[in-house]
Amino acid sequence: MKKPIVQLLLIFTIVSIVLFLLNTSYISLYTFVGALWSITIVGISFVIFIENRSPQSTLAWFLVLALLPIIGVLLYAIFGRSRWRRKKHLHRSEEQRKLFREILEGRRLELLLTVPLNERSIHLTEVIQKFGGGPAADRTTTKLLTNGDQTFSEILRAIEQAKHHIHIQYYIYKSDEIGTKVRDALIQKAKDGVIVRFLYDGLGSNTLRRRFLQPMKEAGIEIVEFDPIFSAWLLETVNYRNHRKIVIVDGEIGFTGGLNVGDEYLGRSKKFPVWRDSHLKIEGKALYKLQAIFLEDWLYASSGLNTYSWDQFMNRQYFPGKEISNAEGAVQIVASGPSSDDKSIRNTLLAVMGSAKKSIWIATPYFIPDQETLTLLRLSAIAGIDVRILYPGKSDSIISDQASQSYFTPLLKAGASIYSYKDGFMHAKIVLVDDTIATIGTANMDVRSFELNYEIISVLYESKTVHDIKRDFEEDFKHSTEIKWNSFQKRSIKKRILESFMRLISPLL
């Protein structure tokens, strides 16, 4: 089943024809429709079986198809993984990895580490590069941006300073007050002669309308939608979304992290008057990788719409090689997605957390780890490492919230500490290890970020920003409630059943 939604539409078309032709025979119609549904369910089950998914995901799909067949088929049409699209993404990966290697080959001497790092950090940079991450870059400065006010102020300031190009990419971009403010800043720079490229995800930014985008097009801004959910086939599966958030100005200043563009990310919503998030500003050599990732996504999403090629971007205007001579530490940027089987971000997080000797602190809005991640955290806690997980006390997803809590029992019993952020919504995606190494980016601690979404994280080694991250953690803990095992185990049977059910269906979504 290359396109599940197409098969469903064909099925319902056939059923409609049969309803018209066989309206005199209720029994025949009932038998025919029943047989048709049975064949569909068996076919979907076979596809799921041969895809070699995780046992949890396979079991979840089988149970839903068996117990709720109609709902199960509809869910598969929307959330099922499309093999033809998977192959398309894998083909993209191979081509673009080769091109990125060419970029790095031309900058090999520039990318050699010159700042001394400790032995563990050096080892991690080498391991992560084998996982598919870019080379670690020194002569790069980073600045932690806490929450939306700091982040959007810095981004707007950088946009205002742009001289050659602005590349902007978001999963969610809303046409509200801050979205309009950023848009108008881009329009002004485009009118000034700056090249502006705007890339947004077809699902996350599905509320963007023509009347909002038209002034951008009229100003000369190039706009591309990443994998539209509506196409000539009416509806695509919603998997394989681009969850990355990237802004690059002149190849010299970059931004990435947890924040999308919208008023709610500034704490302007009634539901979440406080939106706790973290973003990162990057200047220096690490921009090589960030720029390459944006261009990979741009060339993929715009294929067929224009005649761009990598050759047009392989120059100093897009890869200027700006260096910050007095910078400390190093930065390593890692990207992953369905275009690779490497699970680069998941493996990077495992390597970073697995190197811990004293502490592992995690902030994530959704905690639905795979078995390897859960086992590592549990064993680390048993070994006496200070394992802490900070998650939102009030979530924007009941499924993720309840599913997350189903993983708390083995961690609490192992000695880990879990904190529920009580001031608002905790949306930061950060890992801090031993106060010396940290990761910050777009990836949640869940299977969707590890396997299905296009994500990006930055690994920070021995820099001031790592200490700033620790400072934010310590402040966040003050605004959180620690979940104690004695009280947590007293949850009602109804609550435990709900958690288990949400955990069961979470691999589907």
UniProtKB/Swiss-Prot annotation:
CDD domains: PLDc_CLS_1, PLDc_CLS_2
Enzyme class: transferase
Gene Ontology terms describing biological process: cardiolipin biosynthetic process
Molecular function via GO: cardiolipin synthase activity
Gene3D superfamilies given in the database record: Endonuclease Chain A
Name of a matching Pfam family: PLDc_2
Domain PLD phosphodiesterase: from-to ranges: 238-265, 422-449
EC number: 2.7.8.-
Annotated localization: Cell membrane
Alphabetized InterPro entries for the sequence: Cardiolipin_synth_Firmi, Cardiolipin_synthase, CLS_N, PLD-like_dom, PLipase_D/transphosphatidylase
Residues of the active site: H243, K245, D250, H427, K429, D434
GO cellular component: plasma membrane
Catalytic activity: 2 a 1,2-diacyl-sn-glycero-3-phospho-(1'-sn-glycerol) = a cardiolipin + glycerol
NCBIfam families assigned to the protein according to its UniProt record, in alphabetical order: bac_cardiolipin, PRK12452.1
Similarity-based family: Belongs to the phospholipase D family. Cardiolipin synthase subfamily.
Task performed by this protein: Catalyzes the reversible phosphatidyl group transfer from one phosphatidylglycerol molecule to another to form cardiolipin (CL) (diphosphatidylglycerol) and glycerol.
Name assigned to this protein: Cardiolipin synthase 1
Taxonomic lineage from the root: Bacteria, Bacillati, Bacillota, Bacilli, Bacillales
Gene expressing this chain: cls1
